[in-house]
Each structure stands twice: as C-alpha cells, then as structure tokens.
Amino acid sequence: MAIHGYDGKAALQQVNQFWSMLDDMCENNPEEYRSFIQRQMREGAEFHSPPQSHTCIRTAVLGANEGILYINICGWKRVPAPASDKEPVPVCGGRMEKLTEEKEEYSVVDAAFNPEVLQTTEKDKEEKENLCLLALNFIQQQHNLTLSQHYKLTNDKIKGSIRDTKQRLMSTKTCKSTLNGSQSEPAPSLLQQICSLQNTESDEDSSIELSIEQERKPARSGLIEVISSTELDQPQPQLPKHQLTICPDGNGSSRILQLCVELPGVRSVSQCQLRISEDDILLEVEDIYYLLLPFPELVKEETCTAKFNKKKQTLNVTVNVL
C-alpha cells in the first residue's frame, strides 16, 4: 500500500539502523531489551485500542441531499494531541453511512479527537460547544456538505456502536488540524512500518509459527521483518475466505476464539501483516487481501498466537476470550 510523501529508501535505512541497535541491545543488555520490547507492545496495544464514545450531536443536511445527520464525537488515542494550547486541534473522520432505524432514515459519521482534548472541554461549557462546532465544520468540509449550524445533543453518547464507529474511522480515515486547514494522512511511525510477527520454521509441516505473546523470548532470527512499499496501480485487495469459531480450551476452564483464513497465492509470511485488539483483528496482504473482522466477544490480545501453514496457504489464529 503506497503512502504519499513517504521515502521508502530512507525508511529502510532507518530500519536497518534500528535493527542494529536492537541486536546490540539484546546481546549486551538483555533486561533493557526486554523492557523496551514490552513497552513497545504496551504502546502498540494503546494505539490499537478502540475509540471511546463522548458526545453525539444531531443536525440537518441542507440542500439537494437534505436529511438527518448524527455526528459521533469520540476520543481515540490514534489522534495526536496538540503540542500546545496555541497549536491546531487535530481531528480524524471516517466514511459516512446511511441507515434506517424503524421509520427514520438518517446518516451517521464520526469525528475523533485525542482523549486529552475531550477531557479539557469537559471543564468548560463554552469549550465543549466550540468542539461540537469544530466537528460539525470538519464533517461539512470532509464530505462537501452544507450543514445546519444548529444542532442538538442526543441523550446517548453515541449513535450505533463503538465497533461500527471504529470500522468507519478505519475504512477511509482523514486527519486534519482544525485551525489551519491542513489535511493529510497520518504517517506511520517507524515501529508501525515494521512487521511485528515472530516466525520460526518447522521442517515437519513447513509451517511458520507467529506469536505476539509478551512472555515468550524473542527469536534471534526474523524478529523484525522489513516491509517496503512502492507506488503501483494495483487492483483492490479481496476479502479472503475465513471461518470464526469459539470453543472451550483443552482444560474446559475457559474459551478460545479460533480464526482460520484461506490465503491462496500467499507463499511467505513476509507478505502478511497482522494486528489484533480486544474487539477485532486486521489482516493485510499487500494488494491481495484485506480482512477487518470484528470479534463477537472481547478477547485477551496478549494471548494471541498465529500459525501460517505454507502447504495449505492458511493462517490460523487462536486467542483467549475474556
């Protein structure tokens, strides 16, 4: 997947330096290395945490496409906080969805701010009103709409569910600093450009073991996997065939969620990127497959293990249910 304004060669040089640093740290200071890896995993879990509902406003779409619009204002740790009180306030928005509930037809869209911004506005009624207007104007510009500036706070903090909100935000995410009008896709950090899947070869079944468990010792070979991207006009990725089941574990004391994904055409784990949170899983194979799957129940993402079978070209993911 291409990233505009992203220098692939420079990033790969940084990754090589980063790998060298980790290699030295693991060899010379194992405790510091372990602490570093665990800290990155905690921060990664926070980054992939779902948005939190805050306020829902109801307004009207004017003009040819007139109708009712609900805007969910939520907190999301993926959205950066402004560097200071004088800096622009970043906001992210997702796709708009048209729904029908009972006899009411309406549209719903989401505007996400950093949680610290929302906490600040809670202390000041005027600031909260300004935040609502910022969200309203942002959605108006993002979707090229004419919206009524008169809105009403709903009794519920969110229209729909957090899961739906997260899917809309992740599908076509746009970020903007609301005070200066600059708009851009958020650039991924260095660690986000590195595949975090650990792999070990098995001669018996030609499979590759993948794990994100914190307590396992990191493998010396293949701990970090560099993924480069190029600007190519490729067809849209397909939704792979998959099966999701929940069953008791071997002891019968808890339940596990099992996901089997068929990936025909995939021959190497280096093609796969896997991210998991407590309520969903994201699997990407560049330009081939894309799967964003909500879980029917919350899971303990730190217990997730995955196994890629090269012969069958399948990925099997197992994780404990909360």
Curated annotation (Swiss-Prot):
GO cellular component, one term: R2TP complex
Pfam name, any one: PIH1_CS
Example GO BP: box C/D snoRNP assembly
Superkingdom, taxonomy of origin: Eukaryota
InterPro entries in the record: PIH1/Kintoun_subfamily (IPR050734), PIH1_N (IPR012981), PIH1D1/2/3_CS-like (IPR041442)
Family membership: Belongs to the PIH1 family.
Name the UniProt record assigns to this protein: PIH1 domain-containing protein 2
Organism, as annotated: Danio rerio (Zebrafish)
